[in-house]
């Protein structure tokens, strides 16, 4: 039984590692997959599991961009050190809206929107948004082509877009990429800032979910710990590849394909939801 659970954990880790960085909603995909492939765990653990396995994906960002994100990296010039600190300040400013709005409302949104139909609608709505933005951008040139040129004000408003991801199916990366592009950032800058903003956001969110799990009187069994570790390690390994793949992709392509994918998937989920309610 444990062996089968660990195989499922690997599968969930792959789903997380792929969908965390592509603007298609990792939480939405995990919930969808769990309709058909279920871990034999209680509800409290699964709610925590769906968030905490994202830590593996986040650690991949730190590994890939460690030199760029480390202000104490040997060999950096004074200007590079200053730019690194400025980047972290922009990330911190972008976190403010989530701290003020998303954290207090998280449980309420989970209770009311963490279901198939709201997820499907969010997938479609933001899919349409991506198609519209990319069509609009065909005649526009990005104003922000380097992260160092991004203003603190722009960083804050990207953080406001991130708050939208409190609705399951939205996609945190999708919301921030969409917001950054709307605010004039290039696709490369939008993707990079999304990666960096994920570090404090997801560490904080995962920490809160884990803390709530234990405060509510739950505890991890050995099998649950193994499932969580295996899924997180898998998400880490897959993310190393997907992050590099996405950064290369956005240099030559737009996000239209992801918009179309979201619309198709959302439509299929609505059909499935209706079919399930009837039968």
Swiss-Prot record:
Gene Ontology biological process terms in this record: cell wall organization; peptidoglycan biosynthetic process; regulation of cell shape; response to antibiotic
Signal peptide location: none
Encoding gene, per UniProt annotation: uppP
Note: Bacitracin is thought to be involved in the inhibition of peptidoglycan synthesis by sequestering undecaprenyl diphosphate, thereby reducing the pool of lipid carrier available.
Cystine residue pairs: none
Protein name as it appears in the record: Undecaprenyl-diphosphatase
Cellular location(s): Cell membrane
Organism lineage string: Bacteria, Bacillati, Bacillota, Bacilli, Lactobacillales
Primary site of residence: membrane
Molecular function terms from GO: undecaprenyl-diphosphatase activity
Organism superkingdom: Bacteria
């Amino acid at each position: 039984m444990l062996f089968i659970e660990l195989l499922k954990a690997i599968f969930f880790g792959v789903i997380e590692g792929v969908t965390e960085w592509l603007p298609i909603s990792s939480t939405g995909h995990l919930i969808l997959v769990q309709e058909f492939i279920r871990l034999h765990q209680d509800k409290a653990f699964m709610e925590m599991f769906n968030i905490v396995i994202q830590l593996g994906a986040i650690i991949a960002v730190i590994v890939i961009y460690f030199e760029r994100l480390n202000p104490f990296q040997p060999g950096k010039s004074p200007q590079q050190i200053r730019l690194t600190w400025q980047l972290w300040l922009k990330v911190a400013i972008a976190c403010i809206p989530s701290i003020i709005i998303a954290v207090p409302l998280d449980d309420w949104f989970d209770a009311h929107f963490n279901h198939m139909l709201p997820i499907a609608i969010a997938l479609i709505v933001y899919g349409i948004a991506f198609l519209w933005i990319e069509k609009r951008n065909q005649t526009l040139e990005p104003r922000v082509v380097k992260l160092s040129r991004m203003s603190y004000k722009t960083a804050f408003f990207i953080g406001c877009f991130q708050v939208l991801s409190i609705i399951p199916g939205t996609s945190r990366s999708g919301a921030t990429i969409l917001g950054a592009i709307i605010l004039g950032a290039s696709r490369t800058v939008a993707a990079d800032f999304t990666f960096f903003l994920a570090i404090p956001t997801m560490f904080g969110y995962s920490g809160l979910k884990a803390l709530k799990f234990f405060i509510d009187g739950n505890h991890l069994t050995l099998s649950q710990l193994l499932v969580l570790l295996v899924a997180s390690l898998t998400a880490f390994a897959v993310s190393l590849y997907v992050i590099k793949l996405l950064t290369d992709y956005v240099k030559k392509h737009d996000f239209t394909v992801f918009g179309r994918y979201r619309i198709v998937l959302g439509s299929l989920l609505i059909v499935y939801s209706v079919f399930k309610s009837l039968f």
